């Protein structure tokens, strides 16, 4: 029994046999993976030695550490990285590639001159990028690629000299853009802000601007700061497209004049700050189109308090009746200096209604043409409106498809219709009252009758007598009186004398009323005729070329085959023993590999030899025939 129960050592291991050669590499791979995981966890939970970290390494502060480059060892969980006030000069490519959770990157107040393309790769969640107070001279547009969630960009106080077109089109998600204190800025392209359709805040303060740049692409802009510039005048159209703008700051911008209708595009404006400028007067009803305006700052301006400022006093009283001392004080005249504008009334002044120096004139036009009715007052501080024939009052900025009031008060028609016919009244207003002037617009329907290309002009001339001719040699000739009609046009020359000889000339001329369409029709007909002539000429040239080639080919065929009478002779019938072979033709060359070239027959030889030879040739060359020419010219051999 014991012998049966004794187990051999080889039988102790049950199952598959252990293979150490396979186990060792697998163990190495597992250990490597564990090390990588541990290293990743360690890196995710580490903090650079020169920085301070908080909130489970999500906030890394490296301020004023004299860093010359981005430090290593920043946690991948970092959401805010502050590198403020260091010595960094270059942001190299992939400097933040592993910080995929980073939302705020603060690089302000360094010495950054260059930002390489791809420097911000991997920052797909970046929300705010601060680059103010550095040494950038250009907008690093190429570095903004892939910042699809960037909302705020701060470039304040950099020596940037120009802003080219599409400078920010790589970051259409941008909401706030700070370009303030670009003191070396000398040029802003017309398309500089293209692509920023989602921008809500723009700072262009202290940028040495002498005029307002094109802001039309910023259709959602809410706040605009233009303070500290050199904007001597604000003109109509400066804020075109900014229908959603709510806050406008132009503090200390050296503004001297704000022209009529300058703010008409700002329909949503709530607050405007014009403090610390050089304003003395404002155009009548400047703020009237701003129905949502609630706060206005006009202090620290040298206001000249006269009749033209009364409307502003009344407007302030209506806007803030409980606080008329809120806004501005008079600087001149001396008797009103220091008095608040909101406290003035008409008793302080002797005022008059406005004067229209260029009233509109009656106008006759044809349907479809453009037209203008001008109306100019003695001063640009008045407001101008128009009353249409149906009683509608039109002001600058009022939406009409074909009719608009321009900034100078002109009523402009881009395409008149017959329905536009009627009387239009220009109304010029100031604080005292209104002055009106009217004009009639007469629109004639376009004629649809067929036009004649030519009409007859009858010219009647009267020759003066010799005495009168001598007295009028040194004088200017009589002024012709021209009367044009639709069908018959007559030009009359009226002399100074009644004694004359009348001569009548009939001259065909182009009808004035139908001249333009007649010329068009003639040009069309001329083009058609020229086109047909060119086509016929080309076809004739092609036919001549074809005819020439066919004739040349036919001539060659006739040259190689001259017309002659030939007689085909059967060799078996004509060749006899008595006939010498001198007059026989030589045999043609037989182009077969097994035959040699046949030479001319030699004479004389017997008939038997000749017959045998010919029979042998018949069997080889399929019975050739000899051609005998009737003439004594050279003979050709032909194989048939």
Swiss-Prot record:
InterPro entries the record matches: Ig-like_dom (IPR007110), Ig-like_dom_sf (IPR036179), Ig-like_fold (IPR013783), Ig_I-set (IPR013098), Ig_sub (IPR003599), Ig_sub2 (IPR003598), Ig_V-set (IPR013106), Leu-rich_rpt (IPR001611)
Tissue expression profile of the protein: Highly expressed in the cerebral cortex, including frontal, parietal and occipital lobes. Putamen, amygdala, hippocampus and medulla oblongata show moderate expression. Caudate nucleus and thalamus express small amounts, whereas other brain regions show very weak or no expression.
Record keywords: Cell membrane, Disulfide bond, Immunoglobulin domain, Leucine-rich repeat, Membrane, Phosphoprotein, Postsynaptic cell membrane, Repeat, Signal, Synapse, Transmembrane, Transmembrane helix
Transmembrane portions of the chain: 528-548
LRR repeat feature ranges: 77-98, 101-122, 125-146, 149-170, 173-195, 198-219, 220-241, 244-265, 268-289
Region listing for Disordered, in residue ranges: 463-483
Gene3D superfamilies: Immunoglobulins, Ribonuclease Inhibitor
Gene Ontology BP, a term: synaptic membrane adhesion
Signal peptide: 1-44
Modified residues (Phosphoserine): 631
Subcellular location per the Swiss-Prot or TrEMBL entry: Postsynaptic cell membrane
Domain LRRNT: start-end pairs: 45-76
Membrane topology (UniProt): Single-pass type I membrane protein
UniProt entry tagged with the keyword Transmembrane: yes
Domain Ig-like C2-type: from-to ranges: 354-442
Annotated ranges, domain LRRCT: 301-353
Disulfide bonds: 375-426
Subunit structure: Interacts with NTNG1 and WHRN.
Protein's job: May promote neurite outgrowth of developing thalamic neurons.
UniProt domain comment: The LRR region is both necessary and sufficient for the interaction with NTNG1.
Protein name: Leucine-rich repeat-containing protein 4C
The species this protein was found in: Homo sapiens
Taxonomic lineage from the root: Eukaryota, Metazoa, Chordata, Craniata, Vertebrata
